[in-house]
Amino acid sequence: MFVKDGCSECSTRVKALQAQKQPFDVYMVGSQNDDERIRNWAITSGIDPANVRTRQITLNHDGGRWLGLSLGGDLPAVVREVNGQWLRQ
């Protein structure tokens, strides 16, 4: 899932995914490699720290991945790899 800071819809979507008890990765677009920024976003978005400790949810810097996928559109974006191709869900 791709998110950005200051995006209330991103927080809502993360909460919904977390409630499904499925593992997922969070990539923060525009994080500027600031770990504290991602941690603060995760806390305010209601991500359970236990899910991060057990790697049920991972918190990552985007590092240009979102642009590299060329999927376009607004964030949040839940994407999955299907037959070697990344698709928005």
What are these model-predicted stretches?
Residues 24-39, 51-62:
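Thiol-based oxidoreductase modules, predominantly thioredoxin-like and allied folds used
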Residues 45-74:
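Short, internal strand/loop/helix patches
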Residues 73-88:
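A short, hydrophobic beta-strand/beta-hairpin element that forms part of a small beta-sheet core
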